[in-house]
């Protein structure tokens, strides 16, 4: 890449990567191919896919929520309300405030996933207001999954936009028997798709060395959004309305992340995806057998996250474990979690289990 001038002097991916750029030094070609290849993984229509490489998963969530807000306001003439759960990533709460939207907190099921029945109840309470729903596939602490199909069914007949935050799980589920959880396609002929847009982090499952994110939606939905977006601004000097909130964008990351669409990288990702789920199962079994007092849990078989009672500062500090308090019998109890990533080998897990034994 350096020999081609990328990262040698100022490149800029400003604008829509699917439009010709007035700035000759960009990597839009890499960016387009990356979006198309990941669009295939998520089963978007090949002739109706749009997206770009963002600065982070939060940046991708911002574009999804802003697109939803803009489209729904354009259709209904009033701002939507944002629906999400307390298990959603904290960026969703920040973005709700940033976008000036009223939030509707939906209750969760015991596993941490969104409660579809409570969503129905909350939608009925706001029947005349569009709904911008953020579903999480892989919640940050528990690894829970909001059932996208159930949510979409509950939204039937209600003006809505469904954005999926799949920051971690979106990276590996397409390579597992659970790939349908990430698929845009639906067997329901009355629906255009299972969701409207999706955010996936590049620096989580893929191990990309710096924060970046994928944002993918339908080209037709993007065009509806951009028709409203162009009324807000129209920067003539870049020859088109960019369609992104961020203006100047990194050119190095799309060129580097393109590697993850190559056959060898995809094969490695498939191996890694199988491995992390296998090792997560192993860790859970070992903790149930040897440390039942830690109450280790796994939200579902799709998750590579195991959470358990806080084992103490020494373990937490050595392994940089995230911690938080969860309600247990209506009392806050300290918990920690392990996220089993590709670098977490059996040797690492054995050392971790030994440290638990010796604490």
Regions found by a protein language model. Give the residues of each.
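Surface-exposed helix-capping loop/turn segments at secondary-structure junctions
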Residues: 39-49, 74-76, 287-297
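PLP-dependent aminotransferase class I/II
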Residues: 208, 243-259
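N-terminal entrance/gating region of PLP-dependent enzymes' catalytic architecture
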Residues: 1-48, 335-336
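Catalytic cores of large soluble enzymes that bind and process phosphate-bearing ligands
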Residues: 18-30, 56, 84-88, 111-114, ...
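Conserved C-terminal alpha-helix-loop-beta "cap" of PLP-dependent enzymes
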Residues: 78, 222, 227-247, 261, ...
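Glycine- and acidic
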Residues: 14-22, 46-52, 78, 103-108, ...
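Conserved PLP-enzyme active-site core in the AAT-like
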Residues: 56-226
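Amphipathic, well-packed alpha-helical segments that form the structural scaffold of globular domains
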Residues: 32-39, 43, 66-69, 97, ...
């Amino acid at each position: 890449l350096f020999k081609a001038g990328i990262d040698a002097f100022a490149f800029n991916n400003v604008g829509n990567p699917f439009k010709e750029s007035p700035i000759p030094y960009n990597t839009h070609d890499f960016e387009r191919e990356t979006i198309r290849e990941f669009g295939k993984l998520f089963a978007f229509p090949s002739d109706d896919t749009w997206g770009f490489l963002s600065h982070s998963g939060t940046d991708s969530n911002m574009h999804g929520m802003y697109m939803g807000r803009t489209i729904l306001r354009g259709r209904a003439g009033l701002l939507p309300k944002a629906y999400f759960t307390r298990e959603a990533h904290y960026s969703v709460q920040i973005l709700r405030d940033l976008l000036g939207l009223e939030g509707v907190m939906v209750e969760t099921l015991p596993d941490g996933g969104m409660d579809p029945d409570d969503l129905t109840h909350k939608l009925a309470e706001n029947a005349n207001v569009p709904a911008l729903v953020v579903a999480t596939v892989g919640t940050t602490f528990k690894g829970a999954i909001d059932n996208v199909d159930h949510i979409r069914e509950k939204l039937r007949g209600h003006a809505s936009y469904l954005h999926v935050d799949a920051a971690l799980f979106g990276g590996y589920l397409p390579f597992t028997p659970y790939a349908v959880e990430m698929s845009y396609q639906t067997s329901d002929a009355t629906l255009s798709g299972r969701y409207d847009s999706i955010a996936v982090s590049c620096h989580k499952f893929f191990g990309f060395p710096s924060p970046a994110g994928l944002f993918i939606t339908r080209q037709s939905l993007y065009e509806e959004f951009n028709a409203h977006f162009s009324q807000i601004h129209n920067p003539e000097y870049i020859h088109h309305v960019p369609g992104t909130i961020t203006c100047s964008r990194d050119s190095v990351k799309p060129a580097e992340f393109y590697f993850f669409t190559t056959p060898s990288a995809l094969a490695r990702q498939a191996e890694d995806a199988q491995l992390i789920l296998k090792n997560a199962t192993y860790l859970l079994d070992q903790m149930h057998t040897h440390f039942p007092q830690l109450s280790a849990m796994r939200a579902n078989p799709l998750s590579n996250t195991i959470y358990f009672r806080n084992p103490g500062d020494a373990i937490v500090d050595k392994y940089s474990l995230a911690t938080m308090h969860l309600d247990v019998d209506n009392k806050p109890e300290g918990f920690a979690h392990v996220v089993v990533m590709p670098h977490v080998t059996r040797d690492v897990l054995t050392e971790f289990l030994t440290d638990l034994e010796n604490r």
